[in-house]
C-alpha cells in the first residue's frame, strides 16, 4: 500500500500476510468484533484505515459491512440504528455532532465508535459523549505498521490520548540523538517491534 509518509514521493509499504493477519486478529480480540456486528464503512479503501483496519477485521470476524461510496451524514444517520460499529476520522464525528438528529436514540444500537487517521480533539470527544452517551475509542497507527496503540474497549478512554500499545506490540520513545529510551514525559522517536511491522519500502531498501 502506498503512503505519502513525511518526505519526498509516495513509498510502497510492503505488508506480508503475517503483518495483516496478526494485526486484524489483535484488533478483533481487543475491540470484540464478531459475526454479530455491522460496521458503517464510509472511509476510502486506498488507505490503511479503510482497507486494513475496517475491512480486514470485518472479514476476519465475519461481520457485516455497510459500505458507502463516501461519507454522507444523512446516509450515516439512516444506517446507525441497524449498525453496531463505526470507524471514522474526526471530521466524521464533528459533522454528525452538527446534526440535531444525531442523539442517544439514533445511536442506541451502537456498541463502539472508533476514530483515527488524525488527532481527535478532546472537545469533540467530550461533546460526543454528552450527546450520545458513547465515548469514542481513539487509536493510533500508520501504513507501515497498521495499528500500534488503542484506548481500551473496556475501561477508561481518555480524551486526547491514543491509549496503550496493542498486545504483542512493543513501543518505546527514544532520543533521536542517542537512541536511548526516554522517560514518559519526553518527546522523541517512536520505535515499534512486532508481527505488525512491515517488510520495508518497495524498491527502496535505503
Regions found by a protein language model. Name each.
Residues 83-88, 97-157, 170:
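Gly/Ser/Thr-rich phosphate-binding loop
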Residues 172-193:
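Conserved beta-loop-beta connector loops within the AMP-binding
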Amino acid at each position: 500500500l502506498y503512503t505519502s509518509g513525511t518526505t519526498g514521493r509516495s513509498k510502497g509499504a510492503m505488508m506480508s500476510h503475517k503483518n495483516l493477519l496478526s494485526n486484524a486478529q489483535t484488533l478483533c480480540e481487543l475491540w470484540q468484533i464478531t459475526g454479530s456486528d455491522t460496521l458503517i464503512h464510509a472511509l476510502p479503501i486506498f488507505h490503511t484505515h479503510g482497507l486494513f483496519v475496517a475491512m480486514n477485521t470485518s472479514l476476519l470476524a465475519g461481520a457485516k459491512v455497510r459500505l458507502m461510496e463516501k461519507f454522507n451524514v444523512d446516509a450515516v444517520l439512516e444506517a446507525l440504528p441497524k449498525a453496531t460499529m463505526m470507524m471514522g476520522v474526526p471530521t466524521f464525528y464533528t459533522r454528525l455532532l452538527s446534526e440535531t438528529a444525531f442523539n442517544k436514540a439514533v445511536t442506541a444500537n451502537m456498541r463502539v465508535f472508533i476514530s483515527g487517521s488524525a488527532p481527535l480533539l478532546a472537545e469533540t470527544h467530550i461533546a460526543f459523549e454528552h450527546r450520545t452517551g458513547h465515548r469514542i475509542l481513539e487509536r493510533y497507527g500508520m501504513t507501515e505498521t497498521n495499528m500500534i496503540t488503542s484506548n481500551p474497549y473496556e475501561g477508561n478512554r481518555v480524551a486526547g490520548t491514543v491509549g496503550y500499545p496493542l498486545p504483542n506490540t512493543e513501543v518505546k520513545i527514544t532520543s533521536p540523538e542517542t537512541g536511548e529510551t526516554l522517560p514518559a514525559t519526553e518527546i522523541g522517536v517512536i520505535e515499534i517491534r512486532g508481527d505488525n511491522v512491515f517488510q520495508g519500502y518497495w524498491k527502496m531498501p535505503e
